[in-house]
Amino acid sequence: MNKKQKVNSKKKSNFSPGILVLENKSIFNGIGIGYEGTATGEVCFNTSITGYQEIISDPSYAGQIINFTFPHIGNVGTNKQDNESEKVWTRGVIFNSEITNPSNYRSLIELDLWLKKNKIVGLTGLDTRSLTNFIRDKGAPRGTISHIKKGVFPVKKLINKTLKWPGLNGLDLAKTVSTKNKFTWRGLQTWTKEDGFKKTKKKKFRVVAIDYG
């Protein structure tokens, strides 16, 4: 992997610059999306071609920056029903292409605004294949992703921030992302593709769910 890669930088964009630095001092320049800020985490990859909202909100990605291999992200927008957790624990997201405008009847908010709402720093315009190959061969590295309007990044500080981050080894992430209190789910709902979930008074089945941790 080259020490510095600049991908798709000639394409005009309404978004601000962004950057990803890895613990081996590799630098990826791109276009920032979502929340403006800086986040450090373990850089992993996901090969799914659908379900990006479910992936980003999946608590198993706590502390990680997700590199999506599928290039077209954002085409179905986001909604209130597809989150996998009440809080999004993912540190950041990386896409190859600029996010697509939503075209789906279930979409309530476009992905960029959803990322802002959940304070997730995002980056587009990267060579995600190169990054995926690196992760495949070397393992998931520590990395820092940053997105600021001025587009001037203190690279040395970002590298130091990355190297100082202890990583995920040995952490009890299940304890971190799990609910702190017991609760009983009393919702009686039906679901249709036109209207989504709706409350109902009809009781068709008795269901028991056991969580073994």
Regions found by a protein language model. Name each.
Residues N2-G213:
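RNA-binding accessory domains that recognize and position tRNA/RNA substrates
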